């Protein structure tokens, strides 16, 4: 059986690493524009579970995925291959 590397984007939501094009800071102007366009075109995936959006992932399919995990944490998970949830990464609601 082959292995498919996945990235935990928070709250038990995962995405195939091979499908991720970029990870953006949610507060950037470009990310906000992508989010608005994707919502109007029904291409928006919200994986925040009601928390503040911190990262915007652009997927190969053209979908935009919202995550409550900081881009730095997601990048670290990608680099190390460790999907362990760090203390405080998902619990805070600020």
Swiss-Prot record:
Matches recorded under Pfam families: RemA-like
InterPro entries named among the record's database cross-references: RemA-like
Coiled coil start-end: none
Domain of life per record: Bacteria
HAMAP family: RemA
Protein family (similarity comment): Belongs to the RemA family.
NCBIfam families, per database record: PRK04323.1 (NF003315)
Protein name according to UniProt: Putative regulatory protein LEPBI_I0950
Species name: Leptospira biflexa serovar Patoc (strain Patoc 1 / ATCC 23582 / Paris)
Source organism phylogeny: Bacteria, Pseudomonadati, Spirochaetota, Spirochaetia, Leptospirales
